[in-house]
């Protein structure tokens, strides 16, 4: 599975982007650097049982053990103390990144009800794409019976592209169902 996406990039996407943007060197062609998956835990961080369930869900979705993000300073208004767990994140690179991207594009996103493509507004101006997932049940790895509470997370796709247009073209060639840019 991961080899297919990686080979697609090397054999079809790189030559296509070189022709489209007039790159003289293969190293100039934009590529995927990493995919970060981040989830804020909120109230679930107080209960170790729910925290473990959240970490397990992220591990199943990403195929890699997440790291726990802890608060850097205390904020009384949010009832957060320094060092308390506030979120979890996973950074995928290389083969796991390509495997996750392929599952996201071909299996997960088509499972969304009334799906018409993802917004092209998620680019940050530097060639990276951010996507918010509202609930974890769109992933086939997650069983409905195991979920205590619907909770979303953020996916950041980091590329080496310099502009949003290059990143849009790169992701579109991977098969990402992006809506047309305005």
Swiss-Prot record:
GO terms for molecular function: rRNA binding; structural constituent of ribosome. Signal peptide: none annotated. GO terms for biological process: translation. Keywords: Chloroplast, Plastid, Ribonucleoprotein, Ribosomal protein, RNA-binding, rRNA-binding. It comes from the Eukaryota. One of its GO terms (cellular component) is ribonucleoprotein complex. It is found in: Plastid, Chloroplast. Belongs to the universal ribosomal protein uL5 family. HAMAP family: Ribosomal_uL5_B. This is Large ribosomal subunit protein uL5c. It comes from Emiliania huxleyi (Coccolithophore).
């Amino acid at each position: 599975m991961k080899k297919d996406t990686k080979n697609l990039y090397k054999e079809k996407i790189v030559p296509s982007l070189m022709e489209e943007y007039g790159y003289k060197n293969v190293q100039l062609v934009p590529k995927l650097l990493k995919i970060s998956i981040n989830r804020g835990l909120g109230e679930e961080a107080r209960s170790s049982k729910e925290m473990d369930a959240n970490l397990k869900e992220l591990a199943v979705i990403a195929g890699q053990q997440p790291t726990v993000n802890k608060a850097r300073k205390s904020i009384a208004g949010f009832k957060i103390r320094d060092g308390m767990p506030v979120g979890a994140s996973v950074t995928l690179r290389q083969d796991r990144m390509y495997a996750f991207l392929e599952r996201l594009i071909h299996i997960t996103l088509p499972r969304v009800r009334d799906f018409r493509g993802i917004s092209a507004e998620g680019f940050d101006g530097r060639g990276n794409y951010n996507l918010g997932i509202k609930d974890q049940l769109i992933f086939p790895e997650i069983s409905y019976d195991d979920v205590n509470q619907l909770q979303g997370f953020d996916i950041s796709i980091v590329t080496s592209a310099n502009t949003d247009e290059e990143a849009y073209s790169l992701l579109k060639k991977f098969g990402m169902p992006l809506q047309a840019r305005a």
